[in-house]
Each structure stands twice: as C-alpha cells, then as structure tokens.
Amino acid sequence: MFLLASAQKDLSMCSFRLFGLQKPKEKEVWSTEVTDEDFKNAIKDEYGVKYSKDWKRLLKAPIGLKGKYSIREGVKVVGNDAFQGCGFLTNIDLPESLTSIGRNAFWGCDSLTSIIIPNGVTSIGDHAFSKCNSLKSIIIPDSVTSIGNYAFLCCDSLTSINIPDGVTSIGECAFYNCNSLTSINIPDSVTSIGYHAFSDCDSLTSINIPNGVTSIGDCAFENCHSLTSINIPDGVTSIGDCAFSSCYSLTSINIPNSVTSIGYYAFKWCKSLMSINIPDSVTSIGNGAFSDCKSLLNINIPNGVTSIGDSVFVNCNSLISITIPSSVIAIGMNPFRGCHADLKNESKAFIYEHNVLFDRDKTAIISYRAKEANYVIPDSVISIGGFAFSECNSLTSIIIPDSVTSIGDFAFSGCDSLTSINIPNGVTNIGQGAFKNCGSLSPQVKSDIIQRFGGRSLL
C-alpha cells in the first residue's frame, strides 16, 4: 500500500509538472495577400479605408483618398495594392505595430513627399513605392532585412537614402531611374546587388560597394551618367552584363583579384574611362565589354584569360596597344573593329601577319586591320568571320578564293569604298548584313547577291 501510494504521489507530482508546462507561443504571421473573402468580410473606417475584421490588416484605400492619413495602431500589415494609385495622398503615418508592407502598396502615390517606416517592419515588398514621383525622403529602420524588386522604381525626387545594417539583398530594379539620387549608403550586410538595381540613377556621383558583396548584377549601374568613381571590393567574383554600361563620367576603375569574369558590355560607352586594371584572376572577357570606351589609353589582358568575346574593343580609338596573351584560345567576332591600337599576338592559337588576324591554321579570318586598298584572301581560308572587314573604309576591292564557303554576319558592313568583290560558287552561306552600308557596290553586284542569298545579306 505504501509503495502504491508513493507511486501515485510521484505520478501526481509528475503529472502536475508535465501539464503545468506552457507551450511556446508561436510567432504570428500576417499575409500581405488580399482575397475576395477578405473583402467580403472587410470593415471600413470613416475614410472608406477597408480593414480586416480584426483590424490587423489594412486591405484597400479608396483611390480618392486625399491629404494626410494615419493608419490605426495595431495594424500589422499593409496589404498588396492597398494604396495603389492614390494620387492625392500627401502624407501617411504608419503605426509602430506594422511588420510588413505589401507588393504595390503605395505604387503611383505621386503626391506622397515623405515617409517614415516604423521599426518592426522587416520587409518592403516588390513595387512598394514605385512611381512615388514626389517622394523626397524615406527612413528605413534597422529591422528591414530585404528590399523588394522595383521597391523605389522611378522615385524621381528621392535625393538620398540610407539602407540600414541588416539588409542582405537589394532587389532587381530597386532604385531604377531614381534620377535625383545623389548618394546612397550600402551597408556591409549586403551580399548581392540585383539586376538594374541602380540603373538610370543619373545624379549618382559615387558609390561604395561593401566588402560582403560577391556579385554585381546585370545592368546594376547602367546609365549612371554622373558616376565618377566606384570601389569594387575583394570578394566580388563576377561583374554582370552591362553592369557599368554608359557610365559616361567614370574615369578609372580597379577590378579586384577575386573577379574571374567580366560580363557582356560591362563597361560599354564608359567614354571617359582612361585606364583599367584587369587582374590575373580574370579568365573571360564578355562580348563588347569595353566597346566605345573612346578615352581608354591602356589596358592589359592578363595571362590567364582564355577567351575574348565579340567586339570587346570596338571603337576604342584612343587605345595605344593591345597584346593577346598566350593563354587565349578563343576570340569572338572581330574584337578590334574601329580600334587602331598596335596589336601583338603571343597566342599559338592564332596567327597575326600583315595586320590580319587568322586562326591557327589560317582557315578563318578574324580581323582585317590593314589599310591597303586591295586585298587577296589566302587560299587556305574557308570562312570569313563576323565583322572581319567591317568599316575598312580604305578597302576598294577584294578577291575571295574558291576555298571560302561562308561569310559571317556584317563581315564587310560599312566598307563604303568597296567597289569590287567576287563571291565564289562554293560560298553557301552569307550572314545577315554582310554587305550592309557598302554604298559603292554597283547595283548589279547587289542584285546578284540578293538573287543568290536573299536581301538579308544587305540589311
């Protein structure tokens, strides 16, 4: 009896302790999605703004809402599209209880001049403040960890913004076309800068990319015409396509030793860029990467680069010299068109003689850089590469041997002095625009080309 009583006593104490434990409170999750059911059960305040029946979610404001509006304290979420198109809204107070701002929440509120996002908000949704054309200032709290795609797109009046510590990613087009933005602070917590994140920020003069960033997205700073300097930190491994394209005021840039690839058109039309250092870590240079950099005087291609893309140095007409290093095994369509630099070749994968660049076996012409009026293509050549003779204005006649079977895209485009050319019967393919803007070719020659290969070769 004693043992049983003791056991019962122990069991009772154990049971008390067990049932006395409290289950941890789960974190509340509030959705920014608004459904038909939400609208069906919605309640309105005196301004006609719709809320969920528990007053936790703001669902939709009437498009005619004017002046200043204060969201009720206790609201957790501003739903997707909540104030979209409220063009007469000039000021809004967000409650301290707020945690999320939904997609398109204030899209097109073009009279809104300033906004303070309360501490507690963790995410700013896609397009949240897109096209708020009068927005001059915004305070983003330390609690925010992500800025959505297109979040501040076309905020024309925004002059500066501080991105708080804690934000790890800046979304696609987040500040696209914020053309009054002169300065921006990107914290060390950011690891990626998205596609078009700051493109067309025409007043941005300088920017510091933090050490945590490993990739610079495609077109991230495209058309930042006033950008004069930029620091790319160690740790960045790739520079995206068009990343700094048309940064007209950029005079110099240092690429760190961590970068392995330079994307297509990465520095195209950086017309003030005079020098650039490409580190030994780079293995590939994308198509058009430095095209139209008209002030570029010097550039080194390090031994380690294996491929040079199409049109990489097109119209770099101030460039003094270029050396193709021994590591290069692939070269795209005429990278040197419109570039008058002295060319030196150290690669065994190519032959450079008499100012003409061939492949190893002289079966393909890559770039014709001579100034002669007449040229006879060697009998070993099978193909004429894209843009190979493009814009050779001194060329008046050319003889193509019977060995040639293909003529690449735009191969002779812009040869406006060319009057004589033969196309052998063995040629089976002529690329688009192969003879575009060859204004001195006779109508008969053009007619023969069209009859054999179609009008595409002249367009």
Region locations from a protein language model:
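Active-site beta-strand termini and strand-to-loop segments that position acidic
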Residues: 359
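Consensus positions within tandem repeat domains that build extended binding/scaffold surfaces
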Residues: 80-81, 102-107, 125-128, 148-153, ...
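Trp/Tyr-centric glycan-recognition "aromatic platform" motifs on solvent-exposed beta-strand/loop surfaces
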Residues: 365
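Structural signature of tandem-repeat unit edges
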Residues: 2-5, 14-50, 56, 61-77, ...
